[in-house]
Amino acid sequence: MSLFLIGLGLTNALAGNTDASPKIINGEEATAEDYPMTGGMLMDAIFSFGGSGEQAIRTFVCSSTLIAPDVVLLAAHCIDPFAFTFGFGDLSDVDLRWSRMADLSDHDGTQIAAWPSDAIVAWDWVMHPSWDMEAMETGVAINNDIGLLFLDEPVLDVEPAYLLSVDEESQMVEGALVDVVGWGQQIATDFWEAPPAGSYGYKMMGTSSIDELGTHEFHVGADSEDVRKCHGDSGGPSFMAVESESIEPMRLVGVTSHAYDNSDCNETGGVDTRVSVFADWIEAEMIARCDDGTRAWCDEPGLLVAPTELPGGEDTGFIDGEDPAGGCACSSTSSNPMNGLAWLPFVFGWLGTRRRSVLRET
C-alpha cells in the first residue's frame, strides 16, 4: 500500500522538472504563523546497501503536530526504518529533527542542506506497538499508524494542539469539515516521478471534509475537486472545530496515514488515523518519560486539556466565528499492502491544506 511519505527518492533532480503548470492539490500557501503548532520532521542518516556501499541522506520526511511543548504527534511509518529500507539495507546514525519553517524545499532529498535554523533535535521516538507496515490495509481500516517524537528542548512560544475530549467525540461525524496542513506534494505525480520544482516542501493548508468515518481511521477528500493530501503529508494533522466551553475550539482529530485506493493522490485523497482512539497510549508514553525524568517539559505530564479561560480569567477578545488560532498528508496504495512501495522514493508524506478559519457558519 502507499503511504504519504517522501523520504529519499528525489535524487532524479527536482530542479530539472520545471513544468509547474498543473493545478496544486486544491490548497493554499501557509506561513509559519498559520497553524503554528505544525512542523516538518527531517532525518539525517546513513543508508547502507548491504555490502554495496552506503549513502548519507538528509531529507524532509513527514508533516507533524506539536501536542505538548516537547512532544510531536505523527504517523508511525514516518519513524519506521522499514519504510525507508524495505528490507534492502540498514539505516544508521539516525538523527531526527523538527522544524516549523514554512519552506523546507531545500530538504527535498537531492542534497545535504544545512539544518533549518529552528530545527530541534528529537532525543526519542516511539511507534504504536500494534503498528505493522507489512500488514497495512487500504481503505478505512485499522492500521495503528501513529507515533511520537520527544524533543530535546520545549517549544514555549507556540500553543500546542489539543485532542478531542470524551464529551466532544460525538461531534466527529461524516460530513464534518476538517482543516489540513502539510509540506507534501501540491501536484499528483506517478510513483517514480519527481514533483515539479516548487511544488513540494512548502507548507500548505486547506479545508476538506470527513467522507467516511471508521472506528480507527477516516477518509479525507473523496473527490478530485476536494482539498487532498499527497506524498509528504504523512503524519500531518486534520483539525476540526468543536462546540465547547473551551476558548480554543480547534481539535487535532487526524494524522495523515495512507492513500485511500489505487488512484493515489490523483482522485480520492487519503486516510487519517483517528487520534482520539489512541489517546490513552499517547498519554501513557508521555507520562512514562516524565516519571523516569527524561522528558524536557513536565509541567503537565499527560495530554493537555484545552483551557476554558485565559490566564487571569481575561476575556478571549475573539468574536463568534473568528478563529483564535490564526489558521492553524497521499501515498500510493494497492490491494497488496506492499505493492507500489518502491524502495525509498515517495513513501512517507501525506500532506493536506488548511485554511485560516476553523470556525465558520455551517
Residue ranges and their predicted role:
Residues I142-R228, V275-D280:
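Chymotrypsin/trypsin-fold serine protease catalytic domain
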Residues E322-N339:
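Extracellular Ser/Thr-rich, low-complexity/disordered mucin-like segments
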Residues F60-D108, G198-D211, K229, P237-G321:
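C-terminal subregion of chymotrypsin/trypsin-like serine protease catalytic domains
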Residues E33-I67:
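Glycine-biased strand-turn-strand hairpin within the trypsin-fold
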Residues V358-T362:
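Cytoplasmic C-terminal tails of single-pass
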Residues I6-Y35, D291-V305, E309, E314-D320, ...:
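Boundary/junction segments of secreted and surface-exposed precursor proteins
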Residues T18-E33, E54-A56, F84-D157, A161-E169, ...:
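Conserved catalytic-core segment of clan PA serine endopeptidases
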Residues N339-S357:
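A cross-kingdom C-terminal cell-surface attachment/processing module
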